[in-house]
A protein has these predicted regions:
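Bacterial N-terminal signal peptides
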Residues: 7-17
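Positively charged n-region of N-terminal signal peptides that target proteins for export
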Residues: 1-4
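Short amphipathic alpha-helical "recognition" segments used for binding
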Residues: 6-7, 262
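Sequence-structural signature of mature extracellular/luminal beta-sheet repeat domains
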Residues: 22-358
Length: 358
């Protein structure tokens, strides 16, 4: 009997191993055959810059990375990304060079004693003073979610900064976290309390809620207050701009975008709350077929337009904060992994800022 039980256990173990081999291919966990059209079975995630880079020439020590965006200029392109504790935006070029693109990406004042939330970075405690989200407007100008500065700003062609939003009804925002720009120039962004020391209990908090906002032609509108009970974080528009997705608190919400840019019919699109692996919605993007990509438990989730979880791009170093479609063909995803940059090639081009489909 014991031998029979042992044989049965061995068969079950082998069967489980076969199941894992079938569902996990390299850096991809495949939950649906439809994923093969999106990312090839032999696709590999490679660390291209940071303290875990394989090439010594690509070693670079970052603080805490976020909010990448790819900028394509003719045949050449480069990646911009935030280092929040350093309060800078870095520029990475395909030859592996890193340079400072913008100083004081978030907090731009002189007394930072109460600016930016505190966070643990390994054994270090850091202050999130910088921007946490980047995108481009239809004119190709850089737009920043200035978390530590509690403002949304735009970098003009001459290098000056324009404040697009820093107050709602005279009260300071808590800390813009991420943003997306519609083809008509409307900027949608999420706001939370991460721009202040002490966050929700900060004596410098002026708005008693987290929100989703839209700013267009100099007018700021509050679209959703504490949307369906989540703390809003990631945000992205569908390729046809009919839907707006908002992620946070282990849920992804979907809203209908009205003709005036406001939102309606908010509902839970994906619920990750039952997952036992760490991670949740933060960075979010879409590809040209309408698939949604979101950070989540275990890495980056790839979700069909119908809300089905097709698979996960597994990421090292304790998770991924955000990502962006890059390269000239928009078929590479560049990830910010706290202290490293990584890349993987895809089969379907992503939707990039300032190049949205009609």
């Amino acid at each position: 009997m014991k031998r029979l039980a042992l044989c049965a256990l061995l068969v079950l173990s082998l069967g489980f191993g076969l199941l894992i081999a079938q569902t996990a291919s390299g850096d991809i966990v495949r939950l649906d055959p439809a994923l093969d059209a999106i990312v090839s079975p032999n696709a590999k995630l490679e660390i291209i810059q940071g303290d875990q880079a394989q090439q010594p020439s690509n070693f670079f020590y970052f603080g805490a990375l976020e909010g990448p965006v790819w900028v394509q200029e003719g045949q050449n392109g480069y990646l911009l990304f935030c280092d929040i504790p350093a309060n800078v935006v870095y520029k990475w070029t395909p030859d592996g060079k890193v340079s400072v693109f913008l100083e004081k990406s978030g907090f731009r004042g002189t007394d930072a004693s109460n600016a930016g939330m505190q966070a643990n970075n390994g054994r270090l405690e850091v202050i999130y003073l910088g921007a946490s989200g980047l995108t481009l407007d239809p004119q190709g100008r850089l737009v920043l979610a200035g978390l530590g500065g509690r403002e949304v700003t735009r970098v003009e062609k001459d290098g000056s900064r324009t404040v697009l939003a820093d107050r709602y009804e005279g009260k300071r925002l808590g800390g813009p976290n991420d943003l997306v720009v519609k083809s008509d120039g409307a900027v949608y962004f999420t706001d939370m309390t991460a721009g202040m020391r002490g966050r929700d209990t900060s004596p410098f908090r002026e708005l008693p809620f987290n929100g989703v906002y839209m700013v267009k032609d100099g007018n700021l509108r509050l679209l959703e207050k504490d949307p369906l009970g989540i703390v809003p974080n990631g945000i992205v528009l569908a390729p046809d701009e009919k839907y707006l997705y908002v992620g946070g608190s282990r849920k992804i919400l979907r809203y209908d975008v009205q003709s005036d840019g406001t939102l309606a019919n908010g509902r839970v699109f994906v619920d990750m709350s039952t997952e036992t692996v760490p991670g949740g919605p933060d960075g979010m993007k879409v590809d040209q077929k309408g698939n949604i990509y979101s950070t989540g438990p275990g890495g980056v989730w790839i979700i069909s337009p119908e809300g089905k979880h097709l698979g996960t791009i597994r990421t090292p170093e304790g998770g991924v904060t955000n990502f962006a479609f890059g390269d000239a063909d928009a078929k590479a995803i560049y990830f910010t992994l706290r202290r490293n940059l990584a890349r993987i090639r895809m089969n379907i081009p992503g939707v990039r800022p300032a190049t949205r489909q009609s």
